[in-house]
Amino acid sequence: LAKGVEKDSLYTMSEIIRDVLGNQAKIVALSGPTHAEEVVRDMPSTIVSACDDLEVAEKVQNLFQDTCMRVYTNIDVRGVELCGALKNIIALAAGISHGLNYGDNTRAALITRGLSEMTRLGTTMGCLEQTFHGLAGIGDLIVTATSVHSRNFKCGTLIGQGYNVDDATKEVGMVVEGLNALPAAMQLAKRYDVEMPITAMVDAIVKGKVSPNEAVKALMNRDRKTELTKSVADISFENSIIKSKRGLGMKRVITYGT
């Protein structure tokens, strides 16, 4: 099992495999909110089978689908893989907020705005927005940023409590994937000119450039933003077109901002 983004090539795991085996290789990415501790106890779980060949994704879907595991298909392999890497960084941020004794409001804000960062980067790289709003995106993010099983959340909590990164990692006792994902995430953000303030602050904390408290202040004191990427006039115009064509009343068209 492997996931993440290689920091030198910035390839996802499937892209590395394809680079070795060639374009004829049929590669499936499995991802979603599936902590092993619950899967082995046959607790109902859901996952995504992603392949650019839908028939292959469906074959894997049929292999894994049973009464305790529901499998959905997706053709956005890169998007699914990016979700699996980036959500660990946001989980670190959520853990840091927990270690600072902040509450549910703060964690909800980090999850929501963290998802916005993930989506911005992914769509700029050609991934599907729906992928980030599905099981591999928000689904896995919620689990990783809230669960007691999450190594990333636990490591973040320790950092928020004052541990340095090395000691926090040793205390967790396993690989903390969010730490490994940070270099590639920062490089991708720079390459595609995408603003990722939460990711950048986690990176600064890990590198010892700012304290967790300083990072919180920096995030809260950023320039004021709108939650929408489209202007109110554009949204109103689109809604009026939808209304006139369908005659079904106003349907809101909303997209995520920075």
Q: What are these language model-derived features?
A:
Residues 16-24, 44-131:
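Internal alpha-helical scaffold of NAD(P)-dependent oxidoreductase catalytic cores
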Residues 47, 252-253:
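Conserved hydrophobic helix-helix packing surfaces used for dimerization/oligomerization
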Residues 1-44, 60:
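Rossmann-like NAD(P)(H) cofactor-binding subdomain of soluble oxidoreductases
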Residues 256-257:
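Conserved N-terminal Rossmann-fold NAD(P)-binding element of oxidoreductases
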Residues 26-31, 71-75, 196-198:
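General beta-strand structural signal in soluble alpha/beta enzymes
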Residues 1, 28-31, 48-50, 93, ...:
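Short beta-strand segments
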Residues 87, 94-98, 123-133, 139-250:
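NAD(P)-dependent Rossmann-like dehydrogenase/reductase catalytic/cofactor-binding core
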